[in-house]
Curated annotation (Swiss-Prot):
Keywords linked to the UniProt accession: Repeat, Seed storage protein, Signal, Storage protein, Vacuole
Role this protein plays: Zeins are major seed storage proteins.
Organism: Zea mays
GO cellular component annotations of the record: aleurone grain; vacuole
Protein name: Zein-beta
Localisation per UniProt entry: Vacuole, Aleurone grain
Recorded GO MF terms: nutrient reservoir activity
The keyword Lipoprotein belongs to this UniProt entry's keyword annotation: no
Signal peptide (from-to): 1-19
Keyword Manganese: no
Amino acid sequence: MKMVIVLVVWLALSAASASAMQMPCPCAGLQGLYGAGAGLTTMMGAGGLYPYAEYLRQPQCSPLAAAPYYAGCGQTSAMYQPLRQQCCQQQMRMMDVQSVAQQLQMMMQLERAATASSSLYEPALMQQQQQLLAAQGLNPMAMMMAQNMPAMGGLYQYQYQLPSYRTNPCGVSAAIPPYY
């Protein structure tokens, strides 16, 4: 029985190493770009760096998620640690800018709607709110944004993670045949 388990483990490892050998190594296309100050968009448009695009889609940019993409490389992952951090920081900055832009647009629409409805129905309440904000030295837009902006720490941590039932990237289940 132990021999069968050892044989199965050996076959699984050999199959994994064979698939890693067939995967194009992202190191080859990266050597010219590494340290050259190329941005994320330049690297993603390079065409030969498809594994890095897949890696960036992984949640949290974790080193464990990167293991399949660096498996075919003969170099250590310590060389790629600065690149990995740079990509994660760039990705977070892009998400932060998008989130702030969406929040600003939503807040401006809400402010317009609140101003229109308040001026028609409750001008005294609107005036009281403006006086309170002026006494505190706060801009109404800044106060509304501060109340409605989510905390940035860990917000995007699981944004791109697939649900547990969608683990197959193609969305096709091998165990359950499709219904016709």
